[in-house]
Amino acid sequence: MKLNTLRTALSAALIATFALAGCSSGNNTSGMDHGSATPGASSSASTAGQFNDANVLFVQMMIPHHQQAVDMSDMIVAKSGVDPDVTALAKQIKAAQQPEVHTMETWLNAWGPKPMPEGAPHHLLSEGMLDEEQMQALDEDTGREGQRRFVESMIRHHQGAIHLAEKEIAAGKHPEATALAGHIAASQQREIDTMNRLLATV
């Protein structure tokens, strides 16, 4: 899959999150709790009760983070000559994370417009996301080099996701968001363990 068909970390994925969250000019209520989700939203969002800024930040950051993992997985699945275990892992990652993106988008819509924090692109890069040059290299690499780059990059990517999830678990108030964060931390650690084993063979 060519890079120009993908929503990369610092372009369309972040732009989509900006659009979804809304760049409102309202007051920044950093650290404050907010009321229940917007009436009329999906039952998943509307029945979960209170949320706070930690929940909003978690979702704003995790949506593009997850989307890049999906894009990376699409890249490796499209390549020929990739170890079947690596392809299977990529498909597993996409199958897990794409629905989670949709869930988080629902929450963000229900919570209403919130400005994206300044410095978000830089912060996401520090949480394991690939920049455009790294995504280009992943897209262009073939054979053993390509699959090793994917596995090594995804390990760092997962480590960043776990770090974001741990912050949400510690500070978030929305019960379903914190539950999702716990699931992300546990499932991605298992995948890191799998990828570390794969590095010995690919």
Where are these regions (language model features)?
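Bacterial N-terminal signal peptides that target proteins for export
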Residues: M1-L10
